[in-house]
């Protein structure tokens, strides 16, 4: 008697269906289903016992699974009904089984070994998936499925775990005093109070809401999350090529969206406040890349100077700052939410764009993470060197615009 026939003979001291018997040998050979392996193993045991004058009792009801595999078509139909309620391009099956079944399976393995065995849930997932794939004409996707259909085999109940929808784009913020993301009221923490006129928000709207609300509505999702490549100050505009972002829509019922129409819808509803460009499908991996990116940025800054500064001196000072590294202690204005650390940042390039009475306009490109306002006014000596100190005259930022995000991380 071969080792595998011996193991099958030992396994059949319990009344097992062909699926549960064959699953003991799931890793032996290729090209067969577990059901086929089980039939073959059963025939081998019948011959072996027959040679000893013994008879294998006829199969009645599987001791291990209770003949659960007879219900696989019913489970598959339940999955198809559930999946028909949402738009998806692919799927994956998961299952729950009675804990007693798993306990019996482990008992079987302890007797006959599990080196070549496969768990019952793996076979159920595969067999249900094969039927759904054929009937629904949608492929199984193991790595990044649009939806996981979780079948509770005790009740033939199906729960759907719908993957988020990710959409990449770039936004321009054409006005000041709009935050990038929803900002809960500091007084009530979003519950609603007199301070926030019972909206629960510090600001009436945000880039996230102007962009995310229309997409969520069209996708019929339950919520949205905004992942930006950094963020500008609330009082700064974001112009030029726009800031990259990925919007994440939770539990979307629709996935195949007309992004060109959505772009127009967002820009129309933005009402000259927010524009989006280049909407396209994205991924969780691109969210990670977007949030981790640290691109240089180019700014246009209107500076008020308290004192007389001639253009020649100003140009000389600006020239001296090119490729200069500055040290910035955490600014006072953000010290309540940032650790008090000294950070070195590079002023990559800067030049004078315009000069007037008591003010000038500066264009500068800086390393990611540079506090531009503090570079201008010095933050009471917490940023050095700084423009005010170099000019010998106090300077303040009147307005600041981001005019380019110099990134190269976008997926093509």
Question: What does each of the following model-derived ranges do?
Answer:
Residues 1-412:
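Non-catalytic RNA-recognition surface used by pseudouridine synthases
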